[in-house]
Design a protein with these regions (language model features):
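Sec-dependent signal peptide cleavage junction
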Residues: 28-41
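Short, solvent-exposed loop/linker segments at the N-terminal edge
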Residues: 62-66
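N-terminal secretory signal peptides that target proteins for export/translocation
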Residues: 1-12
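Solvent-exposed loop/turn segments flanking beta-strands in beta-repeat/beta-sandwich domains
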Residues: 77-91
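Sec-dependent N-terminal signal peptides
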Residues: 12-28
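Beta-propeller-forming repeat regions
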Residues: 43-57, 67-69, 76, 99-585
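Positively charged, low-complexity intrinsically disordered regions
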Residues: 3, 37-39, 91, 375, ...
Length: 585
C-alpha cells in the first residue's frame, strides 16, 4: 500500500477552525448585537418528531493550535437539555468544566508532543449524565492547525491512446458507515486524465475510497471504464437512507464497476467507449466562436472516449464494506441522445443528485439528468432491501415544457412552501415534493444558486440566482412562487453569485454577483458599490462569530464593514482546492 507523508501529496489535510464549529464565541460579546425581529409566517414546517435523523455521537476533535495549546471541539446534540454543560478530560484527568453558555469548545494548555486522549462527558444539574460521551486521541507529534489523513492513491494508468495519468483526490462526502456515531470520509479519486463533457478523449477510471479519520481505508470501488471521469458524470449520495444507523452510497454505475468486495457489476468484458471518428473534425463540443473549439495538433479523434451507448445502472453500496447491495437500471435513462439536445452526450450526461425528505419523514435519493435542454428528476426510496421509484419528473412530458433548459450546474433542497416536505430548487425552476412542477421563471441555466431564509421578517425562503443567457443577470425570488423580488439584468454571462450574512449593520443576508453592481441588501439596494475584493465561490462560518466568512481556494477572507472591503483572514499554504475556478474545498 502506498502512503504519503504529511507534506507530500496526496494527503488529506483537514484545515479546521475549531471556533467555527460552535455558534457561541467570546468574540461575539460586545461586537455584534442581534436585531429584534418579528418572525414572518410560512417558515419551513418540518415535524422533527417524525424526521429520520442521523444517530451521531459527540464528534470530538482535537487539533494542536500551537506548541502549547490544543483546541478541542465537540457536538451539542438535539437530545441534550438546554442547560447541558460538559466536563473535559485529558487521559482520564479532568482539565476543564465547560459551561453551557460558552459553546462546545475549549483551548487546553498542553505542550507535550506525546499522544493525548480527550474525553467529553455531558453534565446536567451538576452531575455527569452518561448520555452520549465521546473521545478523540490527539496523535503524537500532531501537526499544527490541521488533521492529516494519509491516503492510498490508485495505481497510475495509461489510456488506450497511450496517455499516462496519475490520481488526485477530488470531491468527498461524509457519513457514519459503521454506526458508531462518528463520520467517515467517502473520497472520489479522479485521474489526471479526466474530461469535461465538451471535450473528446479517453479518461482513466474513477475510484471511491472510504477512510476513517485515522487514515484506515475500509474499501475501494472501481467505477470501471464505462463511467467517464469528469466533474459532471458521477454524483454520489452518502446518507443513512434506510434508518439503520449506517450510511449507504448511491450512485450511477455501469458494466464493469467493481464493488468494495471485488465483485463485478454486469458484464466485465463490456467496453462502451467510442474509438473516435478520424473522418470528422476535432476540437470538442463548443460554439463556433469559442476559441476552445479550434482544432489543435494532438487533439483526440471526434467522440473518442465518449460513452454514447451501453447499460447504465443505479447501485446502492454498503457504506461499511463497499459491497453492492442492489443494482437497477438507471433512471433517468439515456434513451435517444438527440432528445437531450445533441448527439455527443454533452447534454445527456449532465448529472446532478440530492437527498430530500419528500414525505416529511424519510430521506430519498433524487437522481437528475440534464439541465441545458431536457431535464429529468427521479426520486427513490431505499428500505434496506429494495430500491423503489417514488416519482419521475420529465420536462418532455406534455405540460412541463416550461421546465426545459432551467437547470443549473447545482441544485438546492428545502421546504419552500411550508408543507413540511422538501422541494427541489432546480436552477430557475422548482419541483414540488410530489414530483410535480411548482413553477418556472424561464430565466434558464446558471452556474450558482443560493436558497435560505434571507431575513426573519420575510415570508418563507428566498433564492438568489445568476444566469448565463446574457439577459437576466442576477435575480432574487420567492422560493415558493418564483415571484421576482428584484433583479439586476446584464448583457453578459453572470458566472458566479454569492449570498451570505457578512455585515452586522445591515438586516438580513447580503447578496452580490459578478454583475450585481455592488453589495445588495434584501430590498435590492446597493449598500457597497465596490466589491472588487469579494470572492464569489464559497461561504463558511470560520472564526466563531455569527457572521460568515468567504473561502476561495486556500484563502479565508472576512468583510470589514467599516472599511467596505474583504481582508484575508487565513491563508493555508500547501492546501489546494478542486474543480478549477469553482475551487471546491
Amino acid at each position: 500500500m502506498r502512503t504519503t507523508s504529511i507534506m507530500k501529496k496526496p494527503s488529506l489535510k483537514f484545515l479546521i477552525s475549531i471556533a467555527a464549529i460552535t455558534v457561541i464565541s467570546i468574540g461575539v460579546s460586545g461586537v455584534l448585537t442581534a436585531p429584534r425581529y418579528k418572525i414572518a409566517a410560512n417558515a419551513p414546517a418540518y415535524d422533527y418528531s417524525k424526521l429520520q435523523k442521523e444517530k451521531l455521537g459527540r464528534g470530538v476533535v482535537a487539533i494542536r493550535e500551537n506548541q502549547s495549546e490544543v483546541a478541542v471541539s465537540w457536538r451539542y446534540l438535539s437530545s441534550d437539555p438546554v442547560n447541558t454543560s460538559f466536563n473535559l478530560y485529558r487521559d482520564g484527568k479532568k482539565v476543564a468544566e465547560v459551561p453551557a453558555t460558552t459553546g462546545t469548545f475549549y483551548r487546553d494548555t498542553y505542550g507535550s508532543k506525546k499522544a493525548a486522549t480527550y474525553t467529553i462527558k455531558p453534565v446536567v444539574n451538576g452531575a455527569e449524565t452518561g448520555h452520549i460521551e465521546g473521545s478523540y486521541t490527539l496523535p503524537a507529534n500532531a501537526p499544527t492547525g490541521y488533521i492529516n489523513i494519509p491516503l492510498d492513491p490508485p495505481t497510475d494508468g495509461t489510456t488506450p491512446a497511450g496517455q499516462k495519468y496519475t490520481y488526485i483526490p477530488n470531491d468527498a462526502s461524509i457519513g457514519d458507515v459503521d454506526g458508531n456515531g462518528e463520520y467517515e470520509i467517502i473520497l472520489k479519486w479522479d485521474p489526471s486524465k479526466a474530461n469535461d463533457n465538451a471535450h473528446d478523449g479517453y479518461t482513466g477510471n474513477v475510484f471511491f475510497d472510504c477512510y476513517r479519520l485515522t487514515g484506515e481505508r475500509l474499501w475501494r470501488i472501481d467505477m470501471g471504464r464505462n463511467i467517464r471521469a469528469g466533474a459532471h458524470y458521477t454524483q454520489f449520495m452518502v446518507y443513512d437512507f434506510d434508518g439503520d444507523g449506517r450510511a449507504e452510497i448511491i450512485m450511477k454505475t455501469s458494466d464493469g464497476t467493481i464493488d468494495g468486495q471485488g465483485n463485478i457489476i454486469g458484464d466485465a468484458s463490456a467496453d462502451y467507449r467510442e474509438p473516435g471518428d478520424p473522418t470528422q473534425p476535432t476540437g470538442g463540443d463548443f460554439d463556433k466562436e469559442d476559441p476552445r473549439g479550434k482544432p489543435r495538433q494532438g487533439d483526440p479523434l471526434r467522440n473518442q472516449g465518449r460513452i454514447l451507448t451501453g447499460n447504465e445502472y443505479l447501485t446502492v453500496f454498503n457504506g461499511l464494506t463497499g459491497a453492492a447491495m442492489k443494482t437497477i437500471d438507471y433512471i433517468p435513462e439515456r434513451g435517444q441522445l438527440e432528445d437531450w439536445g445533441d448527439n455527443r452526450a454533452n447534454r445527456s450526461d449532465r448529472f446532478l443528485a440530492a437527498v430530500a425528505y419528500l414525505d416529511g419523514g424519510h430521506p430519498s435519493p433524487v437522481m437528475c439528468r440534464g439541465y441545458y435542454t431536457r431535464a429529468v428528476l427521479a426520486a427513490f426510496d431505499w428500505n434496506g432491501k429494495e430500491l423503489k421509484q417514488r416519482w419521475v419528473f420529465d420536462s418532455n412530458t406534455p405540460g412541463n415544457e416550461a421546465y426545459a433548459g432551467q437547470g443549473n450546474h447545482n441544485l438546492r433542497v428545502g421546504d419552500v412552501d411550508g408543507d413540511g416536505c422538501d422541494e427541489i430548487i432546480y436552477g430557475s425552476c422548482a419541483i414540488d415534493n410530489n414530483g410535480k412542477g411548482l413553477y418556472s421563471t424561464g430565466m434558464g441555466h446558471g452556474d450558482a444558486i443560493h436558497l435560505t431564509k434571507f431575513s426573519p421578517t420575510m415570508k418563507g425562503r428566498q433564492v438568489w440566482d445568476c444566469h448565463e443567457n446574457k439577459r437576466d443577470g442576477s435575480s432574487f425570488r420567492d422560493a415558493a412562487t418564483g415571484k421576482v423580488l428584484f433583479q439586476v439584468k446584464s448583457g453578459t454571462d453572470v458566472g458566479r453569485c454569492m449570498a451570505a450574512d457578512i455585515d452586522p449593520t445591515n438586516p438580513g443576508v447580503e447578496m452580490w454577483s459578478w454583475e450585481s453592481k455592488g453589495l445588495r441588501n434584501i430590498k435590492g439596494e446597493v449598500i457597497n458599490p465596490d466589491i472588487e475584493s469579494f470572492s464569489t465561490n464559497m461561504a463558511v462560518w470560520w472564526d466563531g462569530d455569527l457572521l460568515r466568512e468567504l473561502l476561495d481556494k486556500n484563502v479565508v477572507s472576512k468583510y470589514d464593514w467599516k472599511a467596505g472591503v474583504c481582508k484575508p483572514l487565513a491563508t493555508f499554504t500547501g492546501a489546494a482546492s478542486n474543480s478549477g475556478t469553482k475551487a471546491t474545498p
